[in-house]
Amino acid sequence: MLAPLFAALLAGAATASPIQERQSSVPVGTIITACTVPNTFALTFDDGPFAYTSELLDLLSSNGVKATFFLNGQNWGSIYDYTSVVTRMDAEGHQIGSHTWSHADLATLDAAGITSQMTQLETALTSILGKVPTYMRPPYFSTNALALSTLGGLGYHVINANIDTLDYEHDDDTIGVAFTNFQNGLASGGTVSLMHDVHAQTVHVLVQEAINAIKAKGLTPVTVGTCLGDASANWYKSGGGSGTTPPPATGGPSPDDTCGGSNGYVCQNSQCCSQWGWCGTTSEYCAAGCQAAYGPCT
């Protein structure tokens, strides 16, 4: 009975599904650390998109592997500078989740601050994909009762991991230590791993070794949603998320530092789009009136 179910889940994960009313059995506002579908494993990557993410997508494609990316809006880079990478993730059947707008420690924020961190990224993903994720990972795995309650109220499944490779400590010739951490977690029955696609050695060395080890153990690397038995239609909700839906950014990268308005241009190089439709980086552009659909706002 499990084989047909698993095959159906894989088929659903590999193709885009229309947004529809969600009927997920995966709980919201509760920390989840492990897969529930037998013989599956979820590779997850945090903190991107960044310079190495495209290479990682190439690697996953060459291995026939689907993964989950928990994205920030403004962290190592601005999500608006990597819109083509984000759309490629989605088109190739990977799962996109939220990692908050700016990698904030949610346990240090009040409900309004938590909501702001989530809805800022929802606005960005609405402009890029026309939809927002229902899965998220708290930065630092840090939550408290208020954070979980707020995230649950926003409809988010909260995903941690039971294998932390600590790859961020080994982005050099000690990357083998991160793989040892991975192997130890895998041997202990871990099924959800944490890595970061912002580190060169993770992408160039660690991921391939991890894929080899997963397959050698007879497990299938899949998205978090698939490993929890959740149909791909449930991984997202309609664009606009928990706040007001801005018009989608349709004009592409700005060629002349204009943005929004009738042209729909998106500011590049981490510039904000001011209320007057110009790209810049000072408070006049990034604070009051900033148009979050066309660049980051602070």
Curated annotation (Swiss-Prot):
Name the species this protein comes from. Answer: Pestalotiopsis sp
Superkingdom of origin organism: Eukaryota
List required co-factors.
Answer: Co(2+)
Q: Please tell me where acetate binds in this chain.
A: 46, 140
Show the active-site residues. Answer: 46, 196
Disulfide connectivity? Answer: 259-273, 267-279, 272-286, 290-297
Which residues of the sequence carry a binding annotation for Co(2+)?
47, 99, 103
What GO biological process terms are annotated to this protein in UniProt?
Answer: cell wall organization; chitin catabolic process; polysaccharide catabolic process; symbiont-mediated evasion of host immune response
NodB homology domain: which residues?
A: 39-222
Give the similarity note: Belongs to the polysaccharide deacetylase family.
Its encoding gene is what?
A: CDA
Q: Which reaction does it catalyse?
A: [(1->4)-N-acetyl-beta-D-glucosaminyl](n) + n H2O = chitosan + n acetate
Q: What does this protein do?
A: Hydrolyzes the N-acetamido groups of N-acetyl-D-glucosamine polymers in chitin to form chitosan and acetate. May play a role in evasion of the host immune response; plant chitinases liberate chitin molecules from the fungal cell wall which act as elicitors of the plant immune response, deacetylation of the liberated chitin neutralizes elicitor activity.
| Gene3D superfamilies listed in its UniProt record | Endochitinase-like, Glycoside hydrolase/deacetylase
Tell me the temperature dependence. Optimum temperature is 55 degrees Celsius.
Pfam families named in the record: Chitin_bind_1, Polysacc_deac_1
The record ties this protein, via PROSITE patterns, to: CHIT_BIND_I_1, CHIT_BIND_I_2, NODB
Q: What does its activity-regulation comment describe?
A: Inhibited by Fe(2+) and to a lesser extent by Mn(2+).
Location in the cell reads: Secreted
As one GO molecular function, the record gives: chitin deacetylase activity
GO CC annotation terms, alphabetical: extracellular region
Protein name (record)? Chitin deacetylase
Question: Sorted alphabetically, which keywords does the UniProt record give?
Answer: Carbohydrate metabolism, Cell wall biogenesis/degradation, Chitin degradation, Chitin-binding, Cobalt, Disulfide bond, Hydrolase, Metal-binding, Polysaccharide degradation, Secreted, Signal, Virulence
* Stretches assigned to the Chitin-binding type-1 domain: 256-298
